Amino acid sequence: MVIAVYPGTFDPFTRGHEDLVRRASNIFDELIVGVAQSPNKRPFFALEERIEIAREVLGHYPNVRVEGFSGLLKDFVRKNGARVIVRGLRAVSDFEYEFQMAGMNRYLLPDVETMFLTPSDQYQFISGTFVREIAVLGGDVSKFVFPSVEKWLKEKTGKTEGSGKSE
């Protein structure tokens, strides 16, 4: 049984993230979506909210589970018995950072492989940062996130679609 971990902050969980989960879940026996605490970032949603959002979106995948974690990814991977770390590469600009991270993970976890997946064409430009910025300004994010995530964003920002004003 091959277990993989797909780690990230998922702030918020986008259609691009789901695209990678869908595809990775077809490759591995079990896929664990690891929602990272990320103390160096200032997340828009709290860890518990990000876990709940990801579970709402991914609940229909029988071989996918969502768990939060803090600390080192290597410890989370070991705890879950994973043999593969899945990472997404949207653009060439992601490659340098992800390549360095894969090298460090190989050093820390020599028996664990990193697998890069590129998103489907329609999701290559989506990033959580862009989605948050659009949502905060009251823009339409429905093409980038699932309806449940859009609801979370509207509740968090107090913005109505397209108005740029608070409700």
Swiss-Prot record:
Compartments where located: Cytoplasm
Protein name (Swiss-Prot/TrEMBL): Phosphopantetheine adenylyltransferase
Binding site for ATP: T9, F10, H17, G88, L89, R90, E98, Y123, Q124, F125, I126, S127, G128, T129
Pathway(s): Cofactor biosynthesis; coenzyme A biosynthesis; CoA from (R)-pantothenate: step 4/5
Superkingdom: Bacteria
Uppermost EC category: transferase
Function: Reversibly transfers an adenylyl group from ATP to 4'-phosphopantetheine, yielding dephospho-CoA (dPCoA) and pyrophosphate.
Cofactor: Mg(2+)
HAMAP family assigned to the protein according to its UniProt record, in alphabetical order: PPAT_bact
One GO cellular component term noted in the UniProt record for this chain: cytoplasm
Keyword presence, Secreted: no
EC number: 2.7.7.3
Matches recorded under InterPro entries: Cyt_trans-like (IPR004821), PPAT (IPR001980), Rossmann-like_a/b/a_fold (IPR014729)
Residues under site feature: Transition state stabilizer: H17
Entry's Gene Ontology BP terms: coenzyme A biosynthetic process
Record flagged with keyword Nucleotidyltransferase: yes
Assembly and binders: Homohexamer.
Gene name per UniProt: coaD
Catalytic activity entry: (R)-4'-phosphopantetheine + ATP + H(+) = 3'-dephospho-CoA + diphosphate
MF-aspect GO terms: ATP binding; pantetheine-phosphate adenylyltransferase activity
Organism, as annotated: Ralstonia pickettii (strain 12J)
Annotated keywords: ATP-binding, Coenzyme A biosynthesis, Cytoplasm, Magnesium, Nucleotide-binding, Nucleotidyltransferase, Transferase
Residues that bind substrate: T9, K41, L73, R87
Similarity section: Belongs to the bacterial CoaD family.
